[in-house]
Amino acid sequence: DIDRQQREYFLQQQIKNIQDELGAGQEDEIDELRQKGRTKKWSSEMAELFEKEVSKLERTNSQSPDFNVQLTYLQTLLGLPWNVFTTDNLNISNAEKTLNKDHYGLEKVKERILEHLAVLKLKGDMKSPIICLYGPPGVGKTSLGRSIAAALKRKYIRMSLGGVHDEAEIRGHRKTYIGAMPGRIIKNLIKAGSSNPVFILDEIDKVSADRQGDPSSALLEVLDPEPVSY
């Protein structure tokens, strides 16, 4: 019995030492998250929310599945380009040259795009409306977006929506799900590293609804500029 008690005591001490070591690693990781958070150009409300979420992570056991979910969420927040913008080149004649060089014809379309850029230049408002390009395959809808990005010197993102039938692909998953991931729009913004890319939603007419939800409704919500933002 004495040998058994000694062995149990020894094993408990080993477990305690391992937990202490894991805790030290967890503290370093949390400190690193806080340091990265201080470099972000976000609002005081967002900074407060971030600190609240980091504190929640601090209280979570590193062996718990919730720890990885919370950590992924915080890493996603840090990966977003908060108030990071590329400088626009709103030179209308340069934009016209770029469009003419890349596309032959399409005069009405190019004229409408140039009008849009001219209004954007006059207003100086980043909240520009969405342009819808429609037509048969192969007429240059997607490549026009690439030319606009090149003319403005903005980052270019193309996101194909063909066959998308799950709302979670647009909006992302709830944090309560194991393996929860952000939606494709958030992922592409992280990839671009800029808050003002030219964002092409390709094949939007091929979005289909099924039992998993209606992605078009999720798109309306995500692309609405009115909700409160941080």
Q: What is the meaning of each model-derived region?
A:
Residues 11, 73, 113, 140-142, ...:
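Conserved RecA-like P-loop NTPase ATPase core
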Residues 133-135, 172, 203:
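The Walker A (P-loop) glycine that initiates the GxxxxGKT/S ATP-binding motif of P-loop NTPases
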Residues 201-230:
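Conserved catalytic/switch belt of AAA+ P-loop NTPases
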